[in-house]
């Protein structure tokens, strides 16, 4: 989904979303970046990024069937207003939302949010607990290490059901957390996909240890997809169209249940002329469509 850089205009969002739905794609995904610290080497993608949830609300209004996901919003936000936003988005999209959560990794964003990054793991677990309470309990009341809620009603609840929660992260503790607490796991843009099967296995193992059904979990891969005309040494999902199609099949064999192609992480797209970037995206949508 056009979300970063000059190509991320409402017109491009509409063009990509409606074409993806016509071509039989199953999901549209967004991501979050609140700040780009001056001098930070994180790359051009993060320099200019639209809000992920407002973008999804726009997409919900111009599509009918395709699912909507965020990978990820970070748990340095406050869970009560986020729970309300996600519940509303789930309802207005008629149940099409998937909520991916991360812990965050940019110190300046933690500082701006007034959150201590040293305790982000425990905070993230309590964050998930609060979200689910907000979506399910008739009366919400919470006294935790990080959050407090006096007895309150939190209505309306998300309809037709609460959105599934995916957790990100690649460290062992993060993968085990996803298996214990979440409805699945989502990989990051920096993921070394050669090791994704082992990470999926670890999430499943943690789910089993927690008495949960690992077969019910989703494993979502953010595909940093970069089409390049000539074959050669490369990372997964970078290369010719044929190589990328082979990689898609290989990822399914590794246990990936959902793959989305994220062109925002291709420097040839985010730094290109917006019209040229959109043309490239539309060609790729056609070439990699599920029925292609």
Question: What is each model feature region?
Answer:
Residues 1, 28-30, 68-70, 97-101, ...:
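Hydrophobic faces of well-ordered beta-strands that scaffold small-molecule active sites
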Residues 21-22, 26, 118-158, 188-292:
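An alpha-helical appendage that flanks or caps ligand/catalytic pockets
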């Amino acid at each position: 989904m056009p979300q970063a850089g000059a190509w991320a205009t409402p017109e491009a969002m509409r063009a990509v979303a409606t074409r993806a739905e016509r071509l039989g794609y199953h999901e549209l995904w967004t991501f979050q970046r609140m700040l780009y610290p001056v001098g930070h080497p994180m790359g051009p993608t993060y320099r200019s990024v639209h809000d992920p949830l407002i973008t999804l609300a726009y997409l919900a209004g111009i599509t009918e069937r395709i699912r909507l996901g965020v990978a990820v919003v970070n748990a340095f936000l406050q869970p009560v207003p986020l729970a309300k936003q996600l519940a509303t988005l789930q309802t207005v999209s008629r149940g099409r939302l998937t909520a991916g959560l991360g812990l965050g990794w940019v110190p300046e964003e933690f500082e701006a949010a007034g959150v201590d990054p040293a305790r982000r793991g425990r905070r993230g677990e309590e964050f998930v607990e609060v979200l689910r309470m907000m979506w399910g309990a008739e009366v919400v009341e919470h006294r935790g290490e990080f959050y407090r809620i006096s007895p309150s009603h939190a209505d309306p609840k998300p309809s037709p059901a609460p959105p599934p929660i995916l957790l990100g992260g690649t460290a062992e503790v993060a993968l085990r957390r996803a298996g214990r607490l979440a409805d699945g796991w989502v990989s990051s843009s920096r993921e070394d996909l050669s090791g994704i099967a082992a990470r999926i296995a670890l999430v499943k193992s943690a789910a089993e240890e927690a008495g949960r059904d690992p077969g019910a979990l989703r494993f979502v891969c953010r595909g940093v997809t970069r089409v390049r005309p000539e074959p050669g040494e490369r990372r997964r999902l970078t290369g010719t169209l044929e190589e990328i199609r082979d990689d898609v099949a290989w990822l399914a064999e590794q246990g990936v249940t959902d793959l989305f192609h994220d062109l925002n992480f291709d420097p040839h797209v985010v730094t290109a002329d917006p019209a040229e970037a959109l043309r490239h995206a539309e060609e790729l949508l056609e070439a990699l469509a599920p029925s292609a």
